[in-house]
């Protein structure tokens, strides 16, 4: 599925709103600090937001928070799980590489993907992944958003991700 770095290619008003916030908080060459995340300012976006933290060596992504809409649509709460522990229903979507790209570039990455629905058929959604600092200069966290374009959804509307067996 396609990914891009130019926010102008986004169709999602929610992804664009988070991009506007990110640019306003950081500026053209500065990654915003996690302390700038104000839930009241981002209230309309919160159900679709994910916050993840970075482990640097080796590079790993651990989800700290997942919005209620993401849980409702995906059928799984990935809070507390590492990305590499999860089995995506989108084998062609290299999520780990997307986060690594954002980590290295210190810039947002946008994209769209298609996932299977539990009842058959597919759902398209758009996403944005944005880097955050936490007091220093290193990228320590990510704030991401998934826009399901008005999909009402119930639990397991799309095929859920699964935690890998150990």
Predicted features, each with a name:
Residues 1-86, 93-166:
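Intrinsically disordered, low-complexity terminal regulatory regions
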């Amino acid at each position: 599925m396609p990914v891009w770095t130019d926010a102008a290619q986004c169709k999602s008003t929610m992804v664009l709103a988070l991009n506007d916030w990110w640019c306003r908080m950081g500026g053209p060459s500065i990654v915003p600090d996690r302390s700038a995340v104000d839930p009241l300012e981002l209230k309309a976006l919160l159900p679709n937001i994910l916050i993840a933290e970075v482990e640097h060596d080796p590079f790993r992504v651990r989800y700290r928070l997942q919005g209620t809409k993401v849980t409702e649509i995906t059928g799984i709460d990935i809070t507390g799980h590492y990305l590499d522990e999860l089995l995506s229903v989108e084998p062609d979507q290299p999520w780990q590489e997307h986060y690594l790209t954002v980590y290295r570039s210190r810039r947002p990455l946008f994209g769209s993907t298609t996932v299977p629905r539990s009842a058959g058929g597919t759902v398209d959604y758009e996403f944005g992944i944005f880097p955050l600092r936490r007091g220093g200069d290193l990228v320590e966290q990510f704030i991401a958003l998934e826009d399901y374009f008005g999909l009402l959804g119930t639990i397991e509307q799309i095929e859920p991700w699964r935690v890998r067996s150990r």
